[in-house]
Swiss-Prot record:
Binding site for substrate: S37
Gene assigned in the entry: bioD
Protein name: ATP-dependent dethiobiotin synthetase BioD
GO molecular function, one term: ATP binding
Active site: K33
Any Pfam family matching the protein: AAA_26
Residues annotated to bind Mg(2+): T16, D50, E110
Enzymatic reactions: (7R,8S)-7,8-diammoniononanoate + CO2 + ATP = (4R,5S)-dethiobiotin + ADP + phosphate + 3 H(+)
Family: Belongs to the dethiobiotin synthetase family.
One GO cellular component, as annotated: cytosol
Binding site for ATP: D12, C13, G14, K15, T16, F17, D50, E110, G111, A112, G113, N170, C171
NCBIfam families found in the cross-reference section: bioD (TIGR00347)
Binding partners and assembly: Homodimer.
GO biological process, one term: biotin biosynthetic process
Lineage: Bacteria, Pseudomonadati, Pseudomonadota, Gammaproteobacteria, Legionellales
Length: 212
């Protein structure tokens, strides 16, 4: 089973939407979101809305999709602390590397926030990737400032020798000035391919998804 880690340029760049689009596009694929904050109680358990969206597609138990759940809608390390818990990045890494799902050929692992979001007082998603070496798919929320955020993310990945399989342009605002020019600028400056583009909540447009 191939595994990909879906990260983004920042919070609310559209990781969950794009991840679901990837699952729709590829047969025999599934998605999980191992860590989520901002969960609410429903039927005596904490539930995350992003994890529920994945469940609607995967039909997997929430315990498999989202084993680490916390209440407050803040950074995972703070939300876990408020719940009297802590996140062990080694356990998260082991879970994502060893999870086996019948008939699934591609597993998309959605992170929480961006690459440098703290999971505890010492570790970030970058440390998770150093442990697992799972290749990254970078979701770029196309908005003012995204070029800077994207190039900074690329630099961190390169310095730490983390493989990036490619990036996806998630077009958030149909009124964004010079959208196509921004995408072209990123294509010229990034060292990995543009895999696909999504337009304002529409279906994913394949550009180079066959490389996955």
């Amino acid at each position: 089973m191939k595994r990909y880690f879906v990260t983004g340029t920042d919070t609310d760049c559209g990781k969950t939407f794009v991840t679901n689009q990837l699952v729709n596009y590829f047969s025999s694929s599934a998605a999980i979101k191992p860590i989520a904050s901002g969960c609410e109680y429903s039927k005596n358990q904490l539930v995350n809305s992003d994890a529920l969206l994945h469940q609607q597609q995967n039909h997997l138990p929430l315990e498999i999709i989202n084993p680490w759940r916390f209440r407050l809608p803040v950074s995972p390390h703070l939300s876990a602390r408020e719940d009297g818990a802590s996140i062990d990045v080694h356990k998260v890494a082991d879970y994502c590397l060893n999870l086996q799902l019948n008939d699934i050929k591609k597993l998309f692992i959605e992170g929480a926030g961006g690459l440098m979001v703290p999971l505890n007082e010492q570790d970030t998603w970058l440390d998770f990737l150093k442990l697992t070496r799972i290749p990254v798919i970078l979701v770029v929320g196309m908005k003012l400032g995204c070029i800077n955020h994207t190039l900074l993310t690329q630099e961190v990945l390169e310095i730490n020798k983390i493989k990036c399989q490619g990036w996806i342009a998630n077009c958030l605002d149909q009124d964004m000035l010079m959208l196509d020019e921004n995408i072209s600028t990123l294509e010229a400056k990034l060292k990995y391919p543009l895999l696909a583009r999504t337009n304002y909540g529409g279906k994913i447009s394949d550009i180079c998804l066959s490389s996955l």
